[in-house]
A protein has these predicted regions:
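General small-molecule cofactor/ligand-binding pocket signal
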Residues: 38-40, 89-94, 149
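Short glycine/proline- and acidic residue-enriched helix-loop micro-motifs
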Residues: 55-60, 88-91
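A structural micro-motif
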Residues: 35, 87, 145-146
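Structural beta-alpha unit
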Residues: 80-117, 137
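A short acidic, glycine-rich active-site loop
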Residues: 58-70
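Gly/Ser-rich helix-loop-strand patches that form or flank binding pockets
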Residues: 1, 109-152
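Small/aliphatic-rich secondary-structure junction motif
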Residues: 2-58, 81-82
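A conditional alpha-helix N-cap/helix-loop micro-motif detector
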Residues: 18, 98-99, 129-132
C-alpha cells in the first residue's frame, strides 16, 4: 500500500545537489501545515581492512560523525528559516556497512513512516551513470509505496 502522508525523508550529503534539495523542500513545503521532515545521512562504515588500526577507524568515524552532525544542523536551520517548526524536523545519521548507499537509504525509508523521499541527483556523466549507476537512479528504480522527488 502506498503511504499518503506528509512525512518527508530528505536524504543528504554535502554536495551542491543535496543543498538544492534542501532548499527545494524548504521552498515547496516550508510554512505549510503538518509536514514533517527527517534529514538523513547514512554514515557508510568502511570495510574492516580499510584502516591499519582500530583506533584509526574510530577516529575517522568520530571526525566524520562530527562533520555530518554539523551539516545536518545547518540544513535543519535552513528548513526552520523556510517556515518548518523546529519540532517537525528530525535528523538521523545512522552508521551502516553500505555496499550501496541507495540500499541503505531505502532500508531507512522502510523503517520510517515517510510517504515521500527527496534526493539530490548526482552530477555523473552518462557514461559514469551507465557504468556505476547513481544513488538517485537506484532509489527511483527500487523505492516502493512512496513518492520520489529527485532534485537536480
Amino acid at each position: 500500500d502506498i503511504r499518503f502522508n506528509r512525512n518527508v525523508l530528505l536524504a543528504v550529503d554535502d554536495s551542491a545537489n543535496a543543498r538544492r534539495a534542501v532548499a527545494y523542500v524548504g521552498f515547496m513545503l516550508g510554512g505549510l501545515e503538518g509536514f514533517r521532515v527527517t534529514l538523513l545521512h547514512v554514515i557508510s562504515v568502511p570495510e574492516e581492512d580499510y584502516f591499519a588500526r582500530v583506533e584509526e577507524k574510530e577516529k575517522w568515524l568520530e571526525d566524520y560523525r562530527r562533520k555530518i552532525e554539523s551539516l545536518l544542523a545547518e540544513y535543519r536551520r535552513e528548513l526552520i528559516g523556510a517556515g518548518f517548526p523546529e519540532s517537525l524536523i528530525q535528523t538521523r545519521a545512522p552508521q551502516r556497512y553500505c555496499p550501496s548507499i541507495a540500499e541503505c537509504i531505502l532500508k531507512e525509508l522502510e523503517s520510517t513512516e515517510c510517504g515521500t523521499i527527496v534526493v539530490g541527483r548526482q552530477g555523473l556523466s552518462r557514461k559514469e551513470e551507465f557504468l556505476f549507476g547513481s544513488v538517485s537512479s537506484k532509489i527511483v528504480g527500487h523505492a516502493r509505496n512512496c513518492a520520489v522527488w529527485v532534485v537536480a
